[in-house]
């Protein structure tokens, strides 16, 4: 059974219930809804399909809302026709609302003329076209064409190493987040996060609406990397979004940055997702390239909690095959992980929760020494399972909770298999009911060794949530 989680992007393919069901049956842990495309009616239809399938299969697949985020794009062109930009010639970008031609084109971000200066690079269409700023005059940015090509309408624009003053959240993002709250999404992936302030702004919106959605920060540019530590602290997880990152910074630097982000998230006990073009060729072909297989495996070796499929499942020709291939790569790679090294590393886990950290570490070590079948972690919020997962035990972590939302959020944690369980009134009842549930599910059997770890409160405060993970017990299954 795979331990690294897989996120699949929804799209035209998943308008079909049979395909949605096949994705869930073949290992999709989280469904990603990309709000850069589609309207609310379309997104709601897919979400209802997901809810229907997860209820039928009794699998708590989570739903992630990926915001469009603040972005810069080119404008419309005369007659809708592409224009040819030739190397060495001049092209003008303007914030004035015009119909572009082969001499001048509109740019959607009104503040760009104030943010750039002579010598700055402007990249268009994933970096296929490169312009160098020569001078700025009012609303016009006069550029030299460094790399030419065909310029189409509404193409993405990146400005490497320039701190643009775009808002952290657009009005569309705020409306989409409100929609996500109403529809019961489990995660928000915030695009183009540059500072921790963006995360706090989203969390304020969630708190005002009584939502416990987890916020994932997408790191996509140099400013986000520069403020990485603060963003990790503010967020509930990180996505290494390598698409725009590979345009904003030199592509050859992305592998090191990926490893650095994953390592920092592991140390901070925050889940991390590796995304973009992982099995990209399977959009068109039934098998991946060797380089893509290696890319997925290396992300697992690096310590990622989850890997993500984008166009492969959203609109590719082989969505289920891509998912199955990713699952098989992950499972094979996990056979060769150095689990001993994970136990020896020091997780800086969550400051005030050092009691929890010590108990979880002891639970993982004990499970290893006794070759325990599973580590069982009853938890209201899922905190214990998140902490356990960072120690990467060989034993499967079973997360038990009465909270459906907590179970779905556990789907992002490495090595955690969530099951719904009732809240128990005492430790003995908790352990007994947990063993009975897992026997009925076929997870454990008679004479198996099980390590149970949980946060338990004193009888005086039995109606309050536990502050720490504070007990560990070894159980031989009757």
Residue ranges and their predicted role:
Residues 1-478:
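Non-catalytic helical/linker scaffolds that mediate oligomerization, partner binding
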């Amino acid at each position: 059974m795979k331990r690294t989680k897989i996120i699949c992007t929804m799209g035209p393919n998943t308008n079909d219930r049979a395909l949605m069901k096949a994705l869930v049956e073949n290992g999709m842990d989280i469904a990603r809804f990309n709000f850069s495309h589609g309207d609310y009616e379309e997104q709601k239809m897919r979400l209802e399909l997901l809810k229907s399938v997860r209820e039928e299969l009794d699998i708590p697949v989570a739903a992630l809302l990926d915001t469009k985020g603040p972005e810069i794009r080119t404008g419309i062109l005369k007659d809708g026709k592409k224009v040819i930009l030739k190397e060495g010639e001049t092209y003008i970008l303007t914030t004035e609302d015009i119909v572009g031609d082969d001499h001048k084109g509109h740019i959607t971000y009104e503040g760009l003329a104030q943010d750039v200066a002579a010598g700055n690079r402007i990249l268009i269409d994933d970096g296929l076209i490169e312009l160098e700023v020569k001078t700025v005059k009012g609303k016009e940015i006069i550029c030299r064409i460094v790399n030419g090509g065909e310029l189409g309408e509404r193409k993405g624009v990146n400005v490497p190493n320039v701190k643009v003053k775009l808002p952290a959240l657009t009005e569309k993002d705020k409306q989409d987040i409100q929609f996500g709250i109403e529809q019961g999404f489990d995660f928000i992936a915030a695009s183009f996060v540059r500072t921790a302030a963006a995360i706090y702004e989203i969390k304020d919106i969630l708190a005002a609406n009584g939502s416990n959605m987890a916020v994932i920060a997408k790191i996509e540019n140099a400013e986000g990397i520069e403020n990485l530590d603060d963003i990790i602290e503010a967020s509930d997880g990180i996505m290494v979004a390598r698409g725009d990152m590979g345009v904003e910074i030199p592509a050859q630097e992305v592998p090191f940055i990926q490893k650095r982000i994953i390592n920092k998230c592991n140390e901070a006990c925050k889940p991390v997702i590796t995304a973009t073009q992982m099995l990209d060729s399977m959009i068109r072909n039934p098998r991946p390239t060797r380089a893509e297989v290696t890319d997925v495996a290396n992300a697992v070796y690096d310590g990622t909690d989850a890997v993500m499929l984008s166009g492969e499942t959203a609109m590719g020709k082989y969505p289920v095959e891509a998912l199955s291939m990713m699952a098989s790569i992950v499972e094979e790679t996990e056979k060769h992980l150095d689990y001993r090294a994970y136990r020896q590393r020091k997780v800086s886990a969550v400051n005030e929760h050092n009691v929890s950290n010590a108990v979880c570490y002891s639970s993982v070590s004990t499970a290893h020494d006794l070759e325990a079948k599973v580590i069982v972690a009853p938890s209201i919020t899922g905190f214990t399972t998140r902490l356990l997962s960072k120690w990467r035990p060989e034993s499967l972590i079973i997360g038990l909770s009465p909270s459906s939302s907590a179970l779905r959020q556990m789907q992002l944690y490495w090595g955690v298999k969530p099951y719904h369980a009732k809240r128990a009134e005492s430790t003995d009842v908790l352990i007994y009911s947990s063993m009975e549930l897992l026997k009925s599910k076929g997870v454990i059997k008679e004479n198996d060794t099980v390590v149970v770890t949980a946060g338990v409160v004193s009888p005086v405060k039995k109606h309050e949530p536990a502050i720490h993970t504070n007990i560990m017990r070894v159980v031989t299954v009757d």
